[in-house]
Every structure is written in C-alpha cells, then in structure tokens.
C-alpha cells in the first residue's frame, strides 16, 4: 500500500502533463470539404473570406501557373496583389446563370465581363470557375 501511495503522485503528474500537452492540438484547422456553387452568399463568404494564393488556372486545352499572385476576400470586397502591387475591387455578388446549365452566385474577381463563381473548398484549396468561353477553373490555396 505504501508503494502505491508513492507511485500515485507520479501517475497524477504524468496524467496532468499528458493532458495539457494534448490541449494544444485541439486548435487544428477544421478540414472543410464542401461545394459552394449551391450555397447562399453568407455561407460562401464565410468559407471564402481570407487570404489566398492563386496557384493555377486550367481548361480542357491549357494550363497556366501563377507566381506571386494573391487574393484577399473580405465579404463584398477583394484585394488582388500581383508582384507586390495591390488592386482592390468590389465582388458584386449576384445570382445568375453560369453557362453550365445552373445558377450560382457570381463575383467579379477576375473580369467584370466574365465573372467567376466559387465551386468548392477542399481543405485549404479553393476552386473558382469563370464564365468565359475558355471556361478556366482556378485553384487557390489558403495562406
């Protein structure tokens, strides 16, 4: 019994140390995997808001990589930064035909004449689809 009383405080200290060490891991980013084209704007904005790096754009014929290009979304506004030069703009959210047979909330992040719409967020990756004839799909990674 006396040995148990000597070991018990050590076990208690070990459990406390282990418990506090694991608390820091609870703050990991939630793994998101959702489509956005079928959501309402408050949900879309909540998932899209923040800093993103534009990595690539592609369609059936072409693939384009981007360097030093970043987009910060903040509800109805964005800031496009390329090679250190920042250009702010308005997203002008509106529900309209995508040209792919369904409606989605379009935004003017690339070109006003060819708006884009958010397709999905998977983990730290955002996919945007433009409504142009070329039909580019853009990949952005959260910073």
What does each model-identified segment do?
Residues 58-65, 75-125, 129-137:
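Contiguous, well-ordered beta-strand patches that form the walls/edges
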Residues 141-143:
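Short, solvent-exposed mixed-charge patches
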Residues 18-21:
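C-terminal motif of bacterial Sec signal peptides marking the signal peptidase cleavage site
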Residues 33-53:
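N-terminal helix-cap/turn-to-beta initiation motif at the start of protein domains
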Residues 23-26:
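Bacterial signal peptide processing site
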Residues 1-9:
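Bacterial N-terminal signal peptides that target proteins for export
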